[in-house]
A protein has these predicted regions:
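Long, hydrophobic N-terminal alpha-helical segment
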Residues: 2-51
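Basic amphipathic alpha-helical segments that dock to polyanions
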Residues: 94-106
């Protein structure tokens, strides 16, 4: 991974660690509303590739109350290239987590689940329409991952071998 000042302007803006951390935090917090134990680390790796990918985000945003498994089944195009997107987004996911840890916004439980720390991040969504959309969709994914409650099912739904 290149140093921050050596990255292209577009990459610095699109994959800003603070924004990536915020999107991750929204998903983690939403997951905790369904399951207080926190989100498994393996599921958290799927959040950014889903929320920052415009097509995926738009499909979920258009039907936020639908079940994720049903929505994914109806929209198979979401899975095209998804495994590669996850791999490509790992460095940015780790940077986002690094910033959240540094700022004391998340903790890692003994069982490896990630939990949010209360009152560390504003509850209101601010920013451009697109950044707000990313945050709202992150909440949907967090909630749906918790409702499915099985990592293998989530991974298989998106065509990834766990």
């Amino acid at each position: 991974m290149k140093r921050w000042d050596q990255r292209p302007f577009e990459i610095r803006n699109l994959f800003n660690p603070a924004f990536c951390g915020l999107v991750l935090f929204r998903a983690l917090h939403s997951y905790e509303e369904e399951d207080a134990r926190g989100m498994p680390f393996s599921l958290s790796l799927l959040v950014l590739p889903l929320c920052l990918h415009k097509d995926s985000r738009e499909v979920i945003a258009s039907s936020p109350r639908s079940y994720l498994l049903k929505t994914t089944e109806k929209n198979q195009q979401l899975m095209v290239g998804f495994a590669d997107r996850v791999t490509q987004m790992l460095p940015y996911t780790f940077e986002g987590f690094g910033l959240l840890m540094e700022r004391g916004c998340i903790v890692i439980a003994d069982d490896g689940r990630i939990q949010t720390v209360p009152n560390k991040v504003r509850k209101t969504f601010t920013g451009t329409d697109e950044t707000v959309s990313c945050q709202k969709v992150a909440r949907v994914f967090g909630r749906e991952f918790a409702r499915i409650a099985d990592r293998v099912t989530v991974y298989m739904t998106f065509g990834i071998r766990p």
